[in-house]
From Swiss-Prot:
Biological source species: Mesorhizobium japonicum (strain LMG 29417 / CECT 9101 / MAFF 303099)
UniProt gene name: arcA
SUPFAM superfamilies in alphabetical order: Pentein
Protein name, per record: Arginine deiminase
Enzyme class: hydrolase
Family under the similarity heading: Belongs to the arginine deiminase family.
Pathway(s) this gene product operates in, as recorded in its UniProt entry: Amino-acid degradation; L-arginine degradation via ADI pathway; carbamoyl phosphate from L-arginine: step 1/2
GO MF annotation list: arginine deiminase activity
InterPro entries listed in its UniProt record: Arg_deiminase
Amino acid sequence: METKFGVHSEVGQLRKVMVCAPGRAHQRLTPSNCDALLFDDVLWVDNAKRDHFDFMTKMRDRGVEVVEMHNLLAETVAVPEGKKWILDNQVVPNQIGLGLVDEVRSYLEGLSNRDLAETLIGGLSTHEFPESIGGEQLELIRDAAGVNEYLLPPLPNTLYTRDTTCWIYGGVTQNPLYWPARHEETILTTSIYKFHPDFAGKVNVWWGDPTKDWGLATLEGGDVMPIGKGNVLIGMSERTSRQAISQLAATLFEKGAAERVIVAAMPKLRAAMHLDTVFTFADRDCVLLYPDIVNGIEAFSYRPDGKGGVELHKDKGTFVETVRDALGLKKMRVVETGGNAYMRERTQWDSGANLVCASPGVVYAYDRNTYTNTLLRKEGIEVITIIGAELGRGRGGGHCMTCPIIRDAVDY
């Protein structure tokens, strides 16, 4: 299928991107539940909203079309088939519990499109659900489970739109995510691509289906980078497994979407949960990396074996050398997150290596990582800062908070 959508590099002109603003889901974060919801602290939500709006504005100032997930989802559930598909997959006994499925579905179907979208992302607690509908069973659940019991869970990690789906050249993957706290997210993004008027019938799906059980095969977009010349980088990390990588590689080769998948074997650490937390591009021939992790990465490559399968070989040289050679570059400029060991670790924790490019040599970065941002500027990179005090509490920066939908290729 010919499609206008596609991401053909990490640094080409960014044309269209999906983000998800902070909202009701983040108001659900408490000191007692934030750990389970994969945040390290509660957010000052009003400030997070302000800072995210500023980020969107700065992207629009550079000519990027920014679409926001709450809005897309409200427009998706306005399509009757889209609403039905979401509710068929969300309002099920395994999520709601027997005895309340029909009641919850009836309640959700009665909401406005905007309220339904807000509820699907923000969650529905047992204490919000009307007693007149829930009856005695709801009362028993409230008494037994307390205020943190949800009929639909809040999804605060939708803030990090990079992970649930990722565009690889001319198509997209619908990713089975690692942590249970995020499993429902892919249902929502998939519904947008299936039913939203801007996307329906216009999207190539390479791999993944959120209605299936993928077992140990987990994939998150923060580990996936289509860097150009038919190459795809994938981090084998805390959250992306070899089982998923091998399946995706085989599918990309079968569909002619890629020629090589370079696997970065990483330690399984929260501080380095994805490849993009330790390694991102700043220009066509410049990368920013956290040396304490990246210098230890082993690189392997999948290629087609010519018989419909794949072959796997260990790459010679360092990870950066492997990337440089794959792009046909004579030299790769490397900027390391700066300072002594203490400063480097703090910078890493504050998503200092998590850049996203607006165009070659123009990046968005958190303001707090001043030392590293200065190093980038000395290398000739234009750094546009965004405020990270609240947005970074789930351990993600500009790269994590953006799902590019259209990005130009780069001439290597």
